[in-house]
Amino acid sequence: MFTKKLETFFLTIILIAVLFLSKNYYDSYTFKINDIPDSYKKRIADKEQEILNLMQSHYGVSFKVPIIVTDKFKERLYGLTAYKNGEITIYLNKNVMRESMDYMVDSVIAHEYAHALIFKLGLRSTQKDGHSKDWEQACENLGSVNCEQYVNSQDVVMGKLPFK
């Protein structure tokens, strides 16, 4: 009798685990194949508006940069600002968004907008990593919670994206 109850108990646990794993797989799959949720879009738009207001108050200029959410990043790079043929574009990594949306909103968007501002103002330094003192100040002024360099100089892109 005890053996039968124990067997039923373990089978129940296995069934619950399989259901849990199936649900996680399904959620990950649907997130990957669909556009980001509207709640994410709103958070990105709200943060962008906050950054534009800070840009206007600190620098007397305000300009929007296209923000593209993509799953084409090869690594765990959170964001990237590309400057090519005079055009600036910010790319955000969809692959890390689900687990790090707060970080993306609190730090990454302003971090990337700081690069865009430095490009636009013509303050690019001779540093190859794109994280000069001017950039650091811009990052702080645009409201990033954390203005640190997260890539090494080999990963910085000036017109060449790490994906196709």
Locate each region found by the language model:
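Metalloprotease/metallohydrolase-associated module, dominated by Zn2+-dependent proteases
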Residues: 3-35, 43-63, 72-103, 120, ...
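Surface-exposed or secretory-pathway low-complexity segments enriched in glycine-proline
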Residues: 68-69
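Active-site recognition of the HExxH zinc-binding catalytic motif
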Residues: 107-120
